[in-house]
Amino acid sequence: VSHHHSWSDRLRAAVAARGRLCVGIDPHPALLEAWDLPRSADGLEVFAELCVEAFVGEVAVVKPQVAFFESYGSAGYAVLERTVGVLRDAGTLVIADAKRGDIGTTMDAYAQAWLEPGSPLSSDAVTVSPYLGFDSLGAALDRAVAHDRGVFVLARTSNPEGSALQHASMSTGGSVAQSIVDAAAARNLVDADTVGLVVGATRDHGLDLSGYRGPVLAPGLGAQGATVNDLAEIFRDCRELLLPNSSRSVLAAGPSVTALRAAATQLRDEIEAGLA
């Protein structure tokens, strides 16, 4: 993996070559069971290896859900470290879905864990939560810029209970979610595409994305509402770097590597056709 290219360049090149689908690696206990794997770090390792074999070279971006590894403690983290390393060595971009959020030196330590070259968990990008204020993410954004990595900030999530908070009005006008979009847009004028947004693939996200230039990670495809055919309309302002994320609908095809790969490539092609 060349680290001399910016995150933006790497993302654009990967998407041009292998489409915009982002596949989740979510070793949910029920999935381990469905794949006939033990609910242990050993089962986790096999699950991750099957996913890697299925997705490398076929999809541009893979998003491991950190919680499902963390639940097995250090053994689970060891599996995650190996998985992230193998994916990145193979040229697949990795978004660590860790949703970290904190302030000052603590935020910086999280950023060091997920974005610093040489860190065991070093990924191409990490998801972060702006609940402590967008500016609390400063250390992570600075580290991302320094190392040509990306940060995806939660703006409007696809879970129904997010609405009350995310649609709440700011004293300055506009919704909380829109304020995150606007802050990300402003930051990207300085550091192109460093700040991505997480915006759920729902028809009613209610955001004005017309002023935002950068990647959008859009979870909730299929399982939580929006279909592939909805994407072009819902995200018309930011289709170029839209990364629709699907985990369940693809992983349901496992444990066969052939079936997993077929599910991913079919969805990838449907997404590309829908966004054309």
Pin down the residues of each PLM region.
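Active-site-adjacent beta->alpha loops and helix N-cap segments on the catalytic face
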Residues: 71-86, 103-108, 132-145, 202-210, ...
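Active-site-proximal loop/turn and secondary-structure-junction residues that shape catalytic pockets
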Residues: 27-31, 66-70, 100-102, 130-132, ...
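Conserved, mostly hydrophobic/aromatic
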Residues: 23, 62, 97, 126, ...
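Acidic (Asp/Glu)-rich catalytic clusters
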Residues: 15-16, 52-58, 82-89, 141-147, ...
